[in-house]
Amino acid sequence: MRNWQAPTRRAALFLALLAVTGSALHAEDAMNSTSSHFAYIGTYNPNGEGVYRVRVDPASGALSQVTLVSKVPNPAQLTLGVGGKTLYVASEVADFNGGKHGGITAYRINPADGALTQLNQVDSQGAGPVYLTSMPDGRHLLVANYVSGSVAVFPIEADGSLGAASSVQQQQGPAGAAKPAAAVNGSFAVSDHNGPHAHMIASDPSGKFVFSTDLGLDRIYQWRFDAASGRLTPNDPPWIAASSAGAGPRHFVFHPDGDTVLLVNEEASTLTSYRFDRQKGTLKQLHAVSALPADYQGTSFASGLALSKNGDTLYVANRLHNSIAQFSVGAGGELKPVAETWTRGDYPRSLALSPDGRYLYALNQRSDNVTRFSVNPTDGKLSFVGGYLPIGSPSQMAFLPPPK
């Protein structure tokens, strides 16, 4: 062992500076751990290896510290349970755990670091689950299986795990038109009008009624929901036709006014607004507009929706056109185009607004990145802030509630 010697003045000064710097860095890390929060990103295999946890800086919206937290197969879709204590992940496959369906995995979330603890796994009751969401009271999980065209309901147990399916409905009917009638000139957007393909399922804010879209049948199904039994029963009428032949209804969102539903049609690249009857639980079409610029010609597939908290601004992602189209939402569900923004990536599969609405993220599946935009608080217009997060085939993003 070398004999210890007193440090020189320069060395002592360096050690003191190092101690101060280290303390500052430690303080900054501590501040970041309390002021930042987490989000989860689902991906497609093979570029994406599973579910990733990222740290979100609430001031800048920057994403960092990408960590693989789950390696379940093809976890393209995910959702938080009510309260943000659990995460549910859909494996978009047809052979989950050696079976013939997809699967849903339930996780408990550690709020301190966003780590996941698996609770259980269930068969999704169909092939290729592409959407899942909790009922407003947090007691049931709704799942849409795209490949098989079925929808299912699962009870959520007290610990957040999933029980056996309480209701399974197989959507049936003649396939929709192969070519969308409302598509722009030069569009070759034709896909999957060969049978039922459930693309989304969600309830109204009251939890009394449920709607599911079927891209293959060009229908929007209307269900009544019994909270005691967790069962779906057809409403009257049980479904309504899409706004145009071959439109391919994909995703929808309820407006904060509680009376309006905004829906995106994938194949036609159009948006449709509906009046929601709160008493009957049915929809009536109001308006329909193109999600693409008036002068665009060619193929594009509309995908994800994001609605501002106040309901004034709707954003829709256009794949192949690789844009985010912005619309104002007026009285009576009227939609007017405001602006379009390049996604800075390829094939935006979904959009996500930060919890405070200050940032919007585009999940670009084919360019393997997530891009970040600031949202103008006055007019909702987007500005690219130079943020690229490299991640393989990102599909969907869910934010943990910010720390209180």
Where on the chain are the PLM-derived regions?
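Short glycine/acidic-enriched loop and turn motifs that connect beta-strands
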Residues: 45-48, 92-98, 147-150, 217-219, ...
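Beta-rich, blade/repeat-based domains predominating
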Residues: 33-34, 72-83, 125-140, 172-207, ...
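An edge-strand/N-cap motif at the start of beta-rich repeat modules
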Residues: 31-56
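Blade-level signature of beta-propeller repeat domains, shared across WD40, Kelch, NHL, RCC1
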Residues: 365-371, 383-404
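A short beta-strand motif characteristic of beta-propeller blades
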Residues: 64-70, 117-122, 185-191, 236-242, ...
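Short loop/turn segments immediately following beta-strands, especially the blade-tip
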Residues: 54-61, 107-114, 153-164, 223-232, ...
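Blade-loop segments of beta-propeller domains
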Residues: 65-134
